[in-house]
Amino acid sequence: MTAQLIDGKSIAASLRQQIAQRVAERRQQGLRTPGLAVILVGSDPASQVYVSHKRKDCEEVGFLSQAYDLPSETTQEALTDLIDRLNDDPAIDGVLLQLPLPEHLDASKLLERIRPDKDVDGFHPYNVGRLAQRIPLLRPCTPKGIMTLLESTGADLYGMDAVVVGASNIVGRPMAMELLLAGCTVTVTHRFTKDLAGHVGRADLVVVAAGKPGLVKGEWIKEGAIVIDVGINRQEDGKLVGDVVYETALPRAGWITPVPGGVGPMTRACLLENTLYAAETLHA
């Protein structure tokens, strides 16, 4: 058996097309264009690439895109003032603060400064709390995108044993809550987990988001399991690889996401989807 690929690029392109169509309809109805402000502090190369992709996505679907590229020495006070201005700007539906930030800045305080109804990344404690209470509003983009990928497989998630490898605030923890909402029995593993291979081997669904290349071995995967690899790691030869050993997981899994071209495109598409939702529902 060889796993079927979950094509994140194709699914994300379809979602962007739907969003672009809705933006065009809004214009025809005389409604304003959804607006996204993206703040980049410093010159981290990976962040610059991510931000350029997000701005290109905005142009593709017809969003208003405002870019704020700030020097690495930008102060906490200056960033707070900028966020406050964007919070009060009626043309802006979403405010995105690109992480990581320079060490002298308090990311938690800045993320909490973004108004919850403009927190299109879904990182604000209010939005995470809504998800935990089973009444999600703006959902964290990567877990939300993964749920869309899972829907594309047609798999019935109810009653599945799901394992989330990695307990980060951005992916692991909200992912576990999304899977609980979908009816899975969820185990979250982390750096103190004693028998990672055993947990993975019992799982019908594995979501790996640890940022460690090759952490999950293909032979650990249960026959026919769904494997979602969130990791994206650049090797010395420049090749991008995930947290799962893809070549050995492929013959065992039922469905698997490639790296690149799996989860990443969906994260970006869900950022657009959240921004459109904010414009149409929260700022109507």
Curated annotation (Swiss-Prot):
Metabolic or biological pathway, per its Swiss-Prot or TrEMBL entry: One-carbon metabolism; tetrahydrofolate interconversion
GO cellular component: cytosol
InterPro entries: Aminoacid_DH-like_N_sf, NAD(P)-bd_dom_sf, THF_DH/CycHdrlase, THF_DH/CycHdrlase_cat_dom, THF_DH/CycHdrlase_NAD-bd_dom
GO annotation (BP), single: methionine biosynthetic process
Catalytic activity: (6R)-5,10-methylene-5,6,7,8-tetrahydrofolate + NADP(+) = (6R)-5,10-methenyltetrahydrofolate + NADPH; (6R)-5,10-methenyltetrahydrofolate + H2O = (6R)-10-formyltetrahydrofolate + H(+)
Source superkingdom: Bacteria
Pfam families: THF_DHG_CYH, THF_DHG_CYH_C
Keywords: Amino-acid biosynthesis, Histidine biosynthesis, Hydrolase, Methionine biosynthesis, Multifunctional enzyme, NADP, One-carbon metabolism, Oxidoreductase, Purine biosynthesis
EC number: 1.5.1.5, 3.5.4.9
Any one GO molecular function term: methylenetetrahydrofolate dehydrogenase (NADP+) activity
Residues the entry annotates as binding NADP(+): 166-168, 232
CDD domains (UniProt xref): NAD_bind_m-THF_DH_Cyclohyd
Entry function: Catalyzes the oxidation of 5,10-methylenetetrahydrofolate to 5,10-methenyltetrahydrofolate and then the hydrolysis of 5,10-methenyltetrahydrofolate to 10-formyltetrahydrofolate.
Family: Belongs to the tetrahydrofolate dehydrogenase/cyclohydrolase family.
Complex and partners: Homodimer.
Annotated protein name in UniProt: Bifunctional protein FolD
Gene transcribed to yield this protein: folD
